[in-house]
Amino acid sequence: MQLYKFKIILLYIFLINLLLSSALVAQSIDHNGANVFMYHRFDEPKYPSTNINTEVLKQHLEYLIQNEFNIVSINEILNKKNLKDPFLTKTTAFTVDDAFLSFFENGWPIFKKYNIPVTLFVSTDVVEENHWNYMSWDQLRQFIKEGGSVGLHSASHGHLPQYNINDIEIDLIESMKLIEKELGLNPKVFAYPYGEASNGIIGLLQKLNINYACLLYTSD
């Protein structure tokens, strides 16, 4: 995952393949910089490409704790004025995309047990429509009350580079307004649906005063 700070600053953050065993994850971690873990579904084997077994999740968390990683919220990383600060060495943050119900029911209790902060990137259309497989606004409010934080993930979860830029702007503003209305928040970090961006979208995020954006970036 790459996190872009607009106004020129660029921070590269390594994306761990979270479907691997804890031993293989350990080999993939960058001990000299910040690592961001990205999850989607928890204990939903029907969706193997985005699911993680919660027993494997526990192994990931225990490895990081036992090896004394500096586990912080993603906002703590992004708010560092000097992105080369030694603070980033062995620093780790956790994010979850989409607000699937399985995160709230299966994943979040584990993160809470280990006292680990999580940023949840919320696609608002499915929440607003009360989709059965996604969190509700009440559950999102509970998540925030219990220490979680939220970021922007568009309203529609569409593949944005394929959209007209005016339609993207309408989509993003709708999402921002709903999050402010329902959660009382004005997030400044955005995760691109499907991890893909374009120069036009980057310019639009600047226009909307969204300071950071997450791109999908895989490493060998």
Regions found by a protein language model. Name each.
Residues L10-S21:
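Bacterial N-terminal signal peptides
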Residues S21-T92:
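N-terminal pre-catalytic segment of deacetylase/amide-hydrolase enzymes
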Residues I170-L172, I201-A213:
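Short, electropositive alpha-helical surface patch
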Residues Y217-D220:
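Conserved small/polar residues in nucleotide/adenosyl-binding loops
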Residues V72, T119-F121, G151, N211-C214:
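Structural detector of well-ordered beta-strand residues that form the stable sheet scaffold
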Residues Q2-L10:
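Bacterial N-terminal signal peptides that target proteins for export
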Residues N32-Y47, F87-T92, F100-G200:
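Metal-dependent polysaccharide deacetylase catalytic core of the NodB/CE4 family, i.e.
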